[in-house]
Amino acid sequence: MATMTDPPVEGFRLSQLIYDTRYRSMTIQVVAFILIMLGLVWLANNVVTNLQALGKDFDFGFLGNRAGYDINQRLVEYSNDSTHGRAAIVGILNTLLVAVLGCITATILGVFAGVLRLSKNWIVSRLMGVYVEGFRNIPLLLWILVIFAVMTEGTPQPRDFRGEDAEASMILGDSVAITNRGIYIPNLVFNRSLGGNEVDAETGAVVASQSAGDMILLLVVIIAGFVASGFIGRRATAIQEKTGVRPPGTFWMRLGAVIVPALIVLVALGATLEYPELRGFNFADGIHLRNSLIALWFALSLYTGAFIAEIVRAGIMAVSKGQTEAAFALGMRPSWTMNLVILPQALRVIIPPLISQFLNLTKNSSLAIAVGYMDVRSTLGGITINQTGRELEGMLLLGLFYLITSLIISGAMNIYNNSVKLQER
């Protein structure tokens, strides 16, 4: 029973959804969500209607059809009799290959360029400035074409390596050949495969048919070694923080955790190096890095490295000058100051924008078609769509690949960023 002191009961009115601040934001969000869903339903209905008008259906069965085209640069077995799904896998691996190589070299180049741009040496600083401004302000596609032209027109032909008075010669102890058809480097061959070897009936030679699986095993062992090395390093750091003394031999233990297991696997698999050799009109054996891969890799590295250099420079400048002065007051060398004091603190500023550069490099690799490098854009998003007419399914798969790859890169880098950021109480 209500009394004279009870507050009046306010009834709900529809106008409150707009004028009452307690409900307004929720109302706007619900309306926006409904409009977006209606738009997606309209688009889906429009696509279905158009497909029916063209006599098409939505199906991914084309991935099992014969591809009928060749891919020159590949990491796994492939022929023109393989399926479109196999071609897509080859393209995905080619994309990941150039993305990983590009991220590594761009980071190394960007760190060096960013540090050297802050050098007190006028010539070094200005040279790095020219590099950064030059590559940042010229389109990436142009650099890809320029490097590709230099590789094809400015390097010797394989026939120039022939004869006693050859015009060209191999480098690094006759193990690497740079030609207008690409770069030939030694190949790691396993003579004792864990999956069993095939023996040539005529020659009795061992064919390492399981080399792909053996290489995966080697990579897994190396990654596990790095994980163990990181655990040893963290354990040593914890002991040092507790006792003030770092355990002796930590560096060699970390190094051994990576090298020793890898060497054991290499010896167990009978690993040897297969060197490129000139036979007839071209080089045989070894690994052939084609000009398309080299041009794309170098261009992505140089272009993205210029942006990373500015990120590194900004991160270093964000660290208080007092840190440098304190390090010098303790008698530390400039190189030690940069490696042990400045860069570890600058990482907190560098990592977030660095994630965006890694994502940009991965997506910029789709320009590979300009020089004939068969990445996933060229295979699944190019030739496969042209042959099958499945443009909707192909583009959906292509977009899904780039989405998943970007999320993985972003997630991994965010985990690393959380490990280096300042821990507050």
Q: Can you annotate each of these PLM segments?
A:
Residues A2-R425:
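Transmembrane alpha-helices and adjacent helix-loop boundaries
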